[in-house]
Curated annotation (Swiss-Prot):
The keyword Nucleotide-binding applies. A zinc finger (unnamed) spans 3-34. The gene is nrdR. It comes from the Bacteria. GO terms for biological process: negative regulation of DNA-templated transcription. The keyword Transcription applies. This is Transcriptional repressor NrdR. HAMAP family: NrdR. Pfam families: ATP-cone, Zn_ribbon_NrdR. Belongs to the NrdR family. Residues 49-139 form the ATP-cone domain. Its cofactor is Zn(2+). Binds 1 zinc ion.
Amino acid sequence: MRCPFCHFVETDVIDTRKLYEGEVIRRRRRCRACGRRFTTYERIESVSLMVVKKDGTREPYDREKIARGVRTACYRRPVSAAAIEQLVNDVETAIMNTDEHEISSQAIGDAVMQRLRDLDEVAYIRFASVYRAFTDIGKLREAVDELLDREGVRNGHLSPKPAEDS
């Protein structure tokens, strides 16, 4: 592995850890020339998957594009980087398990929204406002109302949960 600081090609691995249930390996390395340390990540290379966009064009699947969208939606929200990474991993796993060589951008967006709804409601609304391209405040309000109905919240108050039979 080439050192990002001095570009020397020989480095030593000083620590290795599995992340995200073994889906990613994190390696801490030290350059043999300059002695500086850096981190690398290893993951399975994704298959050649094409994303079919709304206008019919196709582009290669890009995990980082999903991660950027989720990070933007979660900006200044109490969502950890690890939670965002796990969400992206979950979406990617769902996409790869379809065994298709093409997937619509809508299917990817729906998978992200489904998981964001459970992670952070404000991030969900932020993502939905861009993904669904709300054209007016009424559409945004519908999305918020849908979320509130799902959570049992109306007019700022929690709706009572149904009584459980003992």
